[in-house]
Amino acid sequence: MIKEIVKESEKGILIDIEVTTNAKKNEIGKINEWRKRIEIRIKEQPIEGKANKAIIKFLKGIFKSEISINSGTTSSQKTVLIPDKTKEDVVKILKKEIKSI
């Protein structure tokens, strides 16, 4: 399932995520198999881009890499771009972080 969520593109690696805001803490949850997305919980509220900034900062810390939101800036369903990692690196990091694996 994780390999369906993590995709290669010309610009780098894309990850499909589902964001929940107003969480108790920032964390990676489980894989939502129905939506084929990784659940991300963020403490910030989705006001004036605060949640998007928090997502980028949180994922930068996990992947030790630049992160940008490729699509879904105004949606809870987003796709993030990691330009300087391989798919294998990203999958390995996610397997360590995801609660259901």
Curated annotation (Swiss-Prot):
It comes from Methanococcus maripaludis (strain C6 / ATCC BAA-1332). This is UPF0235 protein MmarC6_1603. Belongs to the UPF0235 family. GO terms for cellular component: cytoplasm. InterPro entries: DUF167 (IPR003746), YggU-like_sf (IPR036591). The lineage of its organism: Archaea, Methanobacteriati, Methanobacteriota, Methanomada group, Methanococci.
